Every structure is written in C-alpha cells, then in structure tokens.
Amino acid sequence: MAKKVTGYLKLQVPAGAANPSPPIGPALGQRGLNIMEFCKAFNAQTQKEEKNTPIPVVITIYADRSFTFEMKTPPMSYFLKQAAKIQSGSKAPGRDKAGKVTKAQVREIAEKKMKDLNCDSIESAMKMVEGSARSMGLEVAG
C-alpha cells in the first residue's frame, strides 16, 4: 500500500547551498522531518548545477515523517536576468526598460522551462517567456 501523504512544502533553495539555517530548517523542523537528510540529498542532486542557482523544490511529506522531493527548473526571471545580463528587473516595467532579450534567447529559455510550463508547443512557451520578460521591464527584440 502507498504511503499516506500529509502535505506538500514548496521552497526555493540555492543549488548546492542547502543548510539547516532559515528558511529550510524551520520549515522542515515544524513538520518533523530530518533536516540534514534533506540538505545532504538536495546538495548531492544539485552538484551539477551552477552554485547559488535558485532551484524550486516541492517536498512531499508522508504520515511516517518520511519525504520525497522533486526539483523544478530555475525560475524564468533567473534565466531572463542571465540572458539580459542584468541584476534585477525594472522598477517601473511599463515605462523604464531594464534591458533586451532576443527571440533566440527567448526560445532557448522556453526550451529549458518547457517541462515545468503548462503548455504543449514551444510557441506558447515562448509567449509565456515574453510575457515574463515584459513584466520585468525587458524589451523582446527580433
């Protein structure tokens, strides 16, 4: 028989930098999970990733206080900031432009994010990426 799921926990953890300090420690500790077990497993799975890349993770918590976790791709804003070579988006996205991304960069980001997006075609994924870019104050060129 399958284990009984008691809850889910969503966190965004830097790759290779999971440690028991806040926010990870308290979030897992409140639910009675082994914090160090998660940290070691997460850091082992994110060794290939670039250091400090934010990795969204969904932790499934079971009744016997065991857990499994699924890692997602980094947030779209992370990829867009890398592509535009900026530190942060525009403070006033409708008026001020923070930078530019090309259609080729948008396609590349859409291909990376495809498995986490709720769409079927690369074109619809590109539209989602373009929308995120505009909301950050980035201009989509080409």
Swiss-Prot record:
One GO cellular component term: cytosolic large ribosomal subunit
Signal peptide start-end: none
Keyword Ribosomal protein in annotation: yes
InterPro entries reported for this sequence: Ribosomal_uL11, Ribosomal_uL11_bac-typ, Ribosomal_uL11_C, Ribosomal_uL11_C_sf, Ribosomal_uL11_CS, Ribosomal_uL11_N, Ribosomal_uL11_N_sf
GO molecular function: large ribosomal subunit rRNA binding; structural constituent of ribosome
UniProt-listed GO biological process terms: translation
UniProt cross-references to PANTHER family, sorted A to Z: 60S RIBOSOMAL PROTEIN L12 (PTHR11661), LARGE RIBOSOMAL SUBUNIT PROTEIN UL11M (PTHR11661:SF1)
Family the entry assigns: Belongs to the universal ribosomal protein uL11 family.
Cited function: Forms part of the ribosomal stalk which helps the ribosome interact with GTP-bound translation factors.
Protein name: Large ribosomal subunit protein uL11
Annotated gene: rplK
